[in-house]
Amino acid sequence: IQYAIPGVGERLLARRRLVTPPGQLVAETLALCSPHPERIPPGMVEAAIALIGARADALGVDRAYLQAARSLLRFAAGRGRYYGLMRALPMPVLMLHGEADRLVPVQSARAAAARCPHWMFETFPEVGHIPMMEIPEVVDDRIATWTKLNF
């Protein structure tokens, strides 16, 4: 919640970036996002470290992170409106969700899918918030199948 507070979140992220090496930032983030960060392909980890080390626009990255944190609070405050917007989406939707996601509980994903039965929805055991990094071959297969069915 502290990251969602305007001004506080920006300062916290700036301080963290100053005192934490890129490799540690990536390791901590992956440990938060995945129950099995060791399964993430080493090339993806190396690319993430290089990106953090080379990024010139940290404000843009921080802004995206803070917007996500703040949107969770807005969602919690206005679920009915949010679900209505989801149901109104005119295009096909594929939602893949890790059952071990610590950031967005699988119960929330299941609730969204129940309200939108026209969506294609699948969960994966022992997968967290980043299935595209944790099980990239499976995600690639699901996207390919979904694309063939919908386009």
Model-derived features: where do they sit?
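Catalytic active-site module of serine/aspartate enzymes centered on a nucleophile-bearing elbow/loop
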Residues: 110, 115-151
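Conserved alpha/beta-hydrolase catalytic His-Asp/Glu region
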Residues: 17-88
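Acidic catalytic loop of the alpha/beta-hydrolase fold
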Residues: 75-76, 100-104
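Active-site helix-initiating loop/hinge in glycosyltransferases
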Residues: 98, 105, 134-135
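Short alpha-helix in the alpha/beta-hydrolase fold that links the catalytic acid
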Residues: 45, 81-83, 105-114
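Active-site acidic short loop of glycosyltransferases
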Residues: 90-91, 118
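Flexible "cap/lid" loop of the alpha/beta hydrolase fold
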Residues: 1-16
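Short beta-strand/loop motif that positions the catalytic acidic residue
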Residues: 88-89, 95-97, 101
